[in-house]
Structure formats: C-alpha cells, structure tokens
Amino acid sequence: MDPLGPGMIVNSHLTGLYIAGDVVGLLARAIGGTVLTVWQTIWMGGLLVWVGTAAMMVWSYFKAMHLVTTTYRLQTTKPLPGGKLRVLQISDLHPGKGAVDRKRIPELNRRIRELNPDMILFTGDIFDEHVERPDFDSFNAFFATLDPPGGKWFVLGNHDLFHHWREPSYGRADLEGAFARAHIRILEDVSQLAYVGKDATPVRIVGRKDWLYTQGNRFTPAQLMPNGPDNVYTILLDHEPRELKADAAAGANLILSGHTHGGQIWPTGLVAKLFRYNELNYGMKQITPACAAIVSGGTGTWGYKIRTEGKTELVMVEIEQKDA
C-alpha cells in the first residue's frame, strides 16, 4: 500500500489551509469590527478551505506536468574535453503513474536533443515498482536512441530494484539487459574514465550504490577514489544526497543526486529540512571551493501527477575550464 494515498494528500493540504486560516482569524480578531465579521462568515462555513484545496490540487497537477530545464554553470582549473563539458542529469523519472509516461517520450526526445549534452547521467529511480511493462520497454527503446559522445551512465536508486509496495513488472536481469542494449553503463561502487568523442582528455565518473538499498553497506568515497584529488575532473553519482563532505574530500568535483523530489508533496520537503534527513534537499551547494553538489527535483514525479513542492526538471550542468 502506498503511504501517500489521495486522501492523505488532500488531508495534509486541508490541514495546512486550516492552520493558515486560523492564523488569519487571529489577526482579524485583533483588528475586530467588520473585518472580523466577514472573516468569521467565510471561515466558519469552511468554504475557503475546500475551494482553496480544490484549486491547489488542480494547480499541483499542472505544476507536476510542467517540465523545465534548470541550468547550472561551473568552472574548474582541471582539464576538460575541448575546454568545456555539458552534462545532462536525468533523475527520478518514475514513468507510469507519475507525471511522465511513454506518451511524453517525443517531448523528452525533443528537449534532450535541443540541449545536445556531451554525456547523460542517470541518478536513480528511473523505474520503480509501479511501472508497467509497455512503459519499461518504451523508455528503454528511447534511451537506446540517445547517443551523446561521452556516453550514458547510471546509478541505482532506492526504487529501481528495491521495490517497496508491490511486485514489479521487471527484475534485475531485465534492467541490466535493457540497459546493455541501450549502451547505458551501470555503476555500482565503481569508478571509470569517460571520454567525449575522440578527445583524449578523460573525465572520471564515480557511481555509488544507493544508501537505502544497501542500508549503508557500500564502499566509502575514499575506497572509490583511493588516490584522492588529482588532475582528472571527477563527477560522482549518488542517488541520495548523503556524505557530501566525504565525497568532496575524496576528490569529487561535482556530486549529482536526486531522491528528494524537492519535496514534491507538501509538507514532505519541509519535514525533511527540519529533521535534516538529507544533507541537501534541492538545488546547488558549494561543498568546498573545488566541489559542488546538485540535487535534482526529479524529471518525473513519484506515485501521482501531483506536485506542490519543487519542480519537474531536466538538469543541465555546463562546466568551463579556466586558467589556474
């Protein structure tokens, strides 16, 4: 059973509006007179809350379905292929029940080809236990048509193989076979060098096993990058934004994560920030002068075509080589 059913989602927003309404009511009481009388008439009838919640649910659908491109620009003194690197991050696609299904593949295809990335990095939860086989097959066929010169790289999320709520339409062998045919390299606690076309300048891609999927039983950043910082630009992929300082200390220059969805359904993001569940909930943070971390809000949505926090996005990272 999904923990966030439609009733729970509506109730959470009703509660939020009731609290906001009570705060306004206290202000109206302090002002008194006609303001208080009008507010009591509206509020006690409950009309404002129900209309507000209905409007919010309609707005949340369009917010979920509106795919944007978020661009970050970075600089490095390390050598890059041709002096620059354009990296596209796709994360938390969750095709099927969420905002993205196979009907949106033409839109994704157009958007990705317009961006013309040097490499595509998938940071987990590209599939989950809700995906139906037609969506699974259609997206893998689509991925196979993408041919960035620096390759396609993938790390597992907590949903890709660790299925929480139901038996999936695919297994590990299906995923590995489909990705092999699409020339997507799966990185599970592995570090590899990538090359953009025929340029001899390498970029290191480090892929970590998902923390939740492994319950923390995975290689440390220092084990994955035993030589520490060197002159090779290093991109580390980790589905969940954890151990960012350790990643940076071991030699990562760019850390890409997803998982948080930017909150997606209020008050999930607020609670995550209050309890510091993730080291970074959304956006970019400079961990050290030589390392930045970016957390995507997700290229899709989990479970429902609803988003009241964050945004549905493709993330483009443009890295420029500068003089030391």
Q: How should each PLM-predicted stretch be described?
A:
Residues W43, T53-K78, K97-K103:
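Hydrophobic alpha-helical transmembrane segments in integral membrane proteins
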Residues D2-G5, G32, L74, P106, ...:
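Short amphipathic alpha-helical coupling elements at transmembrane boundaries
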Residues L14-Y18, Y72, R133, W153-V155:
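Non-transmembrane, interaction-prone segments in cytosolic or luminal domains
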Residues P79-A324:
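Soluble catalytic domains of enzymes that build or remodel membrane lipids, polysaccharides, and related
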Residues M1-M65:
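Non-catalytic terminal accessory segments
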